[in-house]
């Protein structure tokens, strides 16, 4: 039977000094011997998805104490991708994922904590904490801050639901007046929480449900609803139970690596494909699997993408549907339930809250349960009042959305499309693969042939788009923006949003070794691997080349012959793999260190030492 890890610093005469310091934090004689639970918070006033988390750590801590544990809270950093977008701040976003994972490891191991509750929410914070959980392999429960309510704007006689991306699109569209743009800006982000569509933050918080590491509703119930408080209270109680099961009953089945097995990672990716999640989830699941020593690769994602249908379309794929609508339809447990009925899941896998995923679905899927409390939980609605306060309203929808034929969540028979919401493409421009969010691609351009317009940075591409230099039929190629070449693998939300604002969303493609925001839509192909900085063929594309994209057949091809490709490679290798023009970009020592050790997107941009 394993000893509590914390015993290292709480027992024995030689630990008198350490106990003295523990006492100075408030511990008493009776606390030595109880499990010490790290409450890993990520509160910051910089990020709307985290601005309401300040007191929630202590809410969890109180439940831990009441359940017989000792709670010790600490904080990680949190970068807001939306605020960092469009300038050099975005260079720091993906590297912050590794920094978060390391900081959690440092704090937990330095102080010999026995278990963790991870309070996350936004883009790189949930993945960073997930990587740490897999690395440490001690009992853990994830609970996120929850989605923001969708914005509402009265526009030219109609009221419509909007989000951050809508504000960006109208700002770049000259047909909108300054007053109209200002109204969208003021209305797009009305409350605390992660941005309201199926963007990266919400995608990842949904995937923790599929991985079995968080409670039902974690990914979908809005941050402002009083029922979300129940998740935090339950997380505090549950983590003490899990810690005691492992350390006192020798039950290793509740450890993260026992729960997040390859089958669980495949379940999570299946969910992601079915709900049209952010392409960034591919990076993060690959990275988490790497930490868990699970053999989960791009080949697995490719195989799943060919047989999993799209069962839900949420903004940005469907602009009038947001996370609050997904919750009303039964949330992630409802999507998982439909996938189970289509025999697309392994429901034998365990979760932190039920013995198996099947047990969880029997209890929480609104189609199969008869529990009125579950129905009420999923009727939790937005409050419609701007606020930065968690759990500040208690409004309910009058009915659930159980329509699986035409509703927000469909069954497999009535899927939005039989092909999944994500696809892996291969070809001579991406030998190790690239990713496209097919749920956001119009059917008319699933096959697209266009003329390359090559840019050595996102900034140069944005300037060309706003300068009306990009025309219908162009393929915008943005390179040297990968994990190493950026460094930091910037998101390309501005280029995709500006293409949409120029009326080119269905007439152009964008191909990059960078990545896309979860808010991106259109024919946006990212994660091209190998990246240009590693000698990838994207670094050999020239203006005027023809690029063929065939999503149904999963291919992307640069139309030049092998001899021309070989000649270009010889010339480029002599020059070195770097942008043709010097970029106005300050790369700090911290970013240079990141670039030295990171790998390609096809491997999750994980560190190799």
Curated annotation (Swiss-Prot):
EC number of the protein: 4.2.1.9
Cofactor(s) for this UniProt protein: [2Fe-2S] cluster; Mg(2+)
Active site: 517 (proton acceptor)
GO aspect biological process, one term: L-valine biosynthetic process
Assigned keywords, A-Z: 2Fe-2S, Amino-acid biosynthesis, Branched-chain amino acid biosynthesis, Iron, Iron-sulfur, Lyase, Magnesium, Metal-binding
Residue list for modification N6-carboxylysine: 124
InterPro entries: Dihydro-acid_dehy_C, DihydroxyA_deHydtase, DiOHA_6PGluconate_deHydtase_CS, ILV_EDD_C, ILV_EDD_N, IlvD/EDD_N
Positions with a binding annotation for [2Fe-2S] cluster: 122, 195
Principal EC category: lyase
GO cellular component terms, semicolon-separated: cytosol
Annotated GO MF terms: 2 iron, 2 sulfur cluster binding; dihydroxy-acid dehydratase activity; magnesium ion binding
Residues bound to Mg(2+): 81, 123-124, 491
Cofactor remark: Binds 1 [2Fe-2S] cluster per subunit. This cluster acts as a Lewis acid cofactor.
Reaction catalyzed: (2R)-2,3-dihydroxy-3-methylbutanoate = 3-methyl-2-oxobutanoate + H2O; (2R,3R)-2,3-dihydroxy-3-methylpentanoate = (S)-3-methyl-2-oxopentanoate + H2O
Pathway membership, UniProt: Amino-acid biosynthesis; L-isoleucine biosynthesis; L-isoleucine from 2-oxobutanoate: step 3/4; Amino-acid biosynthesis; L-valine biosynthesis; L-valine from pyruvate: step 3/4
Family: Belongs to the IlvD/Edd family.
HAMAP family referenced in this protein's UniProt entry, alphabetically: IlvD (MF_00012)
Function: Functions in the biosynthesis of branched-chain amino acids. Catalyzes the dehydration of (2R,3R)-2,3-dihydroxy-3-methylpentanoate (2,3-dihydroxy-3-methylvalerate) into 2-oxo-3-methylpentanoate (2-oxo-3-methylvalerate) and of (2R)-2,3-dihydroxy-3-methylbutanoate (2,3-dihydroxyisovalerate) into 2-oxo-3-methylbutanoate (2-oxoisovalerate), the penultimate precursor to L-isoleucine and L-valine, respectively.
Record text on subunit structure and interactions: Homodimer.
Protein name per Swiss-Prot or TrEMBL: Dihydroxy-acid dehydratase
Organism listed in the record: Acinetobacter baumannii (strain ACICU)
Gene name linked to the record: ilvD
């Amino acid at each position: 039977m394993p000893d509590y890890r914390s015993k290292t610093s709480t027992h024995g005469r030689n630990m008198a000094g350490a106990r003295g310091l523990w006492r100075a934090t408030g511990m008493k004689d009776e606390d030595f011997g109880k499990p010490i639970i790290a409450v890993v918070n990520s509160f910051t006033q910089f990020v709307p998805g985290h601005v309401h988390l300040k007191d929630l750590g202590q809410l969890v801590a109180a439940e831990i104490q009441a359940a017989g544990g000792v709670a010790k809270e600490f904080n990680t950093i949190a970068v807001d991708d939306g605020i960092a977008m469009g300038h050099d701040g975005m260079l720091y976003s993906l590297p912050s994922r590794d920094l978060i994972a390391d900081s959690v490891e440092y704090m937990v191991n330095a102080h010999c904590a026995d278990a963790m509750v991870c309070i996350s929410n936004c883009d790189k914070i949930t993945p960073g904490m997930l990587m740490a959980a897999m690395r440490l392999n001690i009992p853990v429960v994830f609970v996120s801050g929850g989605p923001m309510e969708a914005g509402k704007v009265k526009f030219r006689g109609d009221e419509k639901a909007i989000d951050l991306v809508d504000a960006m699109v109208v700002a770049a569209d000259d047909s909108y007046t300054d007053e109209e743009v200002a109204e969208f800006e003021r209305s797009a982000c009305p409350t605390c929480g992660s941005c309201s569509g199926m963007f990266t933050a919400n995608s990842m918080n949904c995937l923790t449900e599929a991985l079995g590491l968080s409670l039902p509703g974690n990914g979908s119930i809005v941050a402002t609803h009083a029922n979300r408080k129940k998740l935090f209270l339950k997380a505090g109680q549950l983590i003490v139970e899990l810690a005691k099961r492992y350390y006192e009953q020798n039950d290793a089945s509740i450890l993260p690596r026992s729960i997040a097995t390859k089958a669980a990672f495949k379940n999570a990716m299946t969910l992601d494909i079915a709900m049209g999640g952010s392409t960034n989830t591919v990076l993060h699941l690959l990275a988490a699997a790497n930490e868990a020593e699970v053999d989960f690769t791009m080949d697995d994602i490719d195989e799943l993408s060919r047989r999993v249908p799209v069962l839900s379309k949420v903004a940005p794929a469907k602009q009038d549907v947001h996370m609050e609508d997904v919750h009303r339809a039964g949330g992630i447990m409802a999507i998982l339930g439909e996938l189970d009925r289509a025999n697309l899941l392994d429901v034998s896998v365990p979760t932190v809250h039920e013995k198996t995923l099947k047990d969880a679905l029997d209890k929480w899927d609104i189609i199969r349960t008869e529990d009125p409390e579950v129905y009420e939980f999923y009727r939790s609605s937005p409050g419609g009042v701007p606020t930065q306060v968690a759990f500040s309203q208690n409004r309910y929808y009058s009915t659930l959305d159980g329509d699986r034929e035409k509703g927000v969540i469909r069954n497999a028979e009535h899927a939005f499309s039989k092909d999944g919401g994500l696809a892996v493409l291969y070809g001579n421009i991406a030998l190790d693969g690239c990713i496209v969010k097919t749920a956001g691609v119009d059917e008319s351009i699933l096959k697209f042939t266009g003329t390359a317009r090559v840019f050595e940075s996102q900034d140069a591409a944005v300037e060309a788009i706003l300068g009306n230099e990009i025309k219908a039929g162009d393929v915008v190629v943005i390179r040297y923006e990968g994990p190493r070449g950026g460094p930091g693998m910037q998101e390309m939300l501005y280029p995709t949003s500006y293409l949409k604002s120029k009326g080119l969303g269905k007439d152009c493609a964008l191909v990059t070794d960078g990545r896309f925001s979860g808010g991106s839509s259109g024919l946006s192909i990212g994660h091209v691997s190998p990246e240009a900085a590693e000698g990838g063929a994207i670094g050999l594309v020239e203006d005027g080349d023809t690029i063929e994209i065939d999503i149904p057949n999963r291919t992307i091809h640069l139309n030049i012959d092998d001899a021309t490709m070989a000649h270009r490679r010889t010339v480029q290798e002599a020059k070195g793999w770097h942008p043709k023009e010097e970029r106005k970009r300050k790369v700090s020592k911290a970013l240079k260190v990141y670039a030295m050790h990171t790998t390609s997107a096809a491997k999750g941009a994980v560190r190799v030492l």
